[in-house]
Every structure is written in C-alpha cells, then in structure tokens.
Amino acid sequence: MTTVLKNKYAETGFPNDPILLDPKMIVRTDVEAVKVVVDACLKPEKSPLIKSNLAENIGIHSLWFKDERNRMNMGSFKAIGATYVLAREASEKVGLNASEDDLKKSLKGRTYVTASAGNHGLSLANGARLFGAKAIIYLSKTVPTEFAEFIKTYGADVVVAGENYEASMAAAAEAATQNNWTLLSDSTWENYSAGVDVMAGYLIMASEAFEECPVTPTHIFLQAGIGGFPASVAAFARRYYGNEPKIIIVEPTEAPVIQASISAGKAVEVKGEVSIMGRLDCKVPSLAALSSLASTANYCMTITDQEST
C-alpha cells in the first residue's frame, strides 16, 4: 500500500544531529568545483530534459523528467558519481590539463572496491576503465545475472556475496581492509564519508535540469535507495530554488528506509521482502544523506512493486 509521510523536520533537520558536527559528512552543493573536473577529464554531453505528455492526462500544468539513459553510453542515472571521484583523483595526480594518454594511465596500480545495487557499481567500473585502475564490484544474490555480466564488460571483476545490498557492502568493506584496496561506496556511515564526494557527481545532472527547466517546479520527485542521489539533488534544489518547491522522496514499500528514519527522527534499519525495484531495495540509509534529507525533503512516499510496473 502506498504511504505518505509529511516531514516534520523540513527546513530545520533533526534536532542535535551529530552528523552536522563533521564537515566531511555535509552534503555538497558546490557544482562549480565539480564541473571543473568533469569538463576537463570526462567531457560528457548534456542529457536531455524531456517534457512528458502525461501532464495533460493527469491534469497538471507540466511534467518534466531528466533522461540519463545515454549519458556516457552507460544507461545509468549515476553515470557521473563514482566516475567523478576517480576523475578528481586522476586530475590531482597528473593535472587538469593532462593529455588523454596520461589520464588513461593516471590511476594504474590502484584497486577500488564497492558494493552496489547496480548504478553506482557501473559508474565505478567505468571510472576505473577510463583512468587505468582496477574495479571490483560486490553484488548481492538478488542482482540479476545479466546486470553482473554487463558490469564485467567495463573491465570490472564482479563478486556475488550476501543476500542483500547491506550484506554485500559488508563483504566489500572486509575485502578492502584485507587487501589494502580503496573502498568507494556511495553510502556513508560512522567514520566513513567518501560517499559524500560520490554524491557530488550527481550535481551535474541537477544543475543541467534546473538550468534547462523553463519554469520553477512546484514539486520535485526523487527516487531513493540509501538516499545519496536524492540528497544531492534536493540539497542543490534548495540552493537553486530556495524553499518554494515541494520535494518528495519516493521509495519501494519493501524498503522505505528514508521514510522510516525520518518518522523515527534517526537512522533505522527496515525489514521487508525483496522489491522488484532492485536498485532501490536498500534497508539501511546513508547517514549523511539522511541528515540532509531531514531538512530538505517535505514528504516521503512509497509505491508498491505493482504500481511501479
């Protein structure tokens, strides 16, 4: 059943939130700094903002969606996420004005590992391929075999471990420690903040969408897994538009971790069956993302698997 929660912490955030005391856990909105690296090292074409014909059918003024399917030929809305982080590390090593050949081998010898429900792992695999690094992607047993094979086409190694995303992340973190690899998750937790920089890559998408949209949106709907993507876009929306648009976070009914956490006033783990919305089927939130969404989101809602098809 669909549920809707009004966020009582909107505009103020969780009271006495310890996450706000750590500067590394603050969600970034500095898209200008991100663009410098992306334009120099990745040079992606803009993705289109499309006006949907559904608006007339449902009786609203207009409905717009950002189509990321062809971004960097990846078919992923997180194409510029982990790839941005690796581009930044490459530019720090060889310089923003380095040749394409120098960039291609700039991270040679480095191994990055992560767990993913899909999109983030693909972005890391692509970034490693572009800059000469090695990527190892941990996937849970619920991720389709076809997607695992697709990630391998980017040169990454794939390890299937755990019954869900959280178990595969634990396995990836353990492997990173044992092998001295770099763990690059798009999530954040206590004493781990690298996901904040991954989230910064999503600012490119948000910036493009807001600049292209001819009207100020009244409502912005953002899908959530662990919360990194919507937290980044919502934070930038508040910088760009202020408090005018209503921001709604959308999750599967089987994994309403942002809704449940905001309802509880703190991060909680949720239980549920496996959702067919596999890339959103996450039961534990990113702490930095949740902290930010507590102040930037107005509502949380869920949709059922049946409604999503």
Regions found by a protein language model. Give the residues of each.
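PLP-dependent amino-acid enzyme catalytic core
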Residues: 1-309
